[in-house]
Regions:
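Catalytic core of pol beta-like nucleotidyltransferases
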Residues: 1-25, 35-40, 51-108
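Short beta-strand->loop micro-motif that forms the acidic, two-metal-ion catalytic signature
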Residues: 45-49
Length: 108
């Protein structure tokens, strides 16, 4: 896995998500790729914030899109999906994951 491959995969996923859910989709990369200490077989951790209510069906749509990108680019993508309403709430701000992503996350 190299940086160019990672960037192409992330942009491809972002394009598919915007096509499906609209221009207000937000992506943040976190974990080893964001820190720059990833290895050849690391996964790409991506927070997906959507402008719609997130339920199981919506999550499945995101996971399916990510899976298609995984197959195309030969990478592993770990997605976490939240609605914009939840992600920008006090409840989300109390989560350790939120704090980690705020600290090291990179907007795409």
């Amino acid at each position: 896995m190299n940086q160019a491959q990672i960037e192409k995969a992330i942009q491809a996923l972002k394009k598919e998500l915007i096509n499906r859910f609209g221009a207000e989709v937000e992506l943040r990369i976190f974990g080893s790729v964001a820190r720059g200490d990833y290895r050849e077989y690391s996964d790409i951790d991506i927070l997906v914030v959507l402008p719609v209510v997130v339920n199981n069906a919506v999550e499945e749509q995101v996971f399916d899109l990510a899976y298609d990108i995984e197959l195309e680019y030969g990478l592993v993508i770990g997605t976490i999906v939240y609605s914009k309403e939840f992600w920008y709430s006090d409840r989300a701000a109390a989560m350790p994951l939120y704090k980690k992503i705020q600290r090291e996350g990179l907007f795409v």
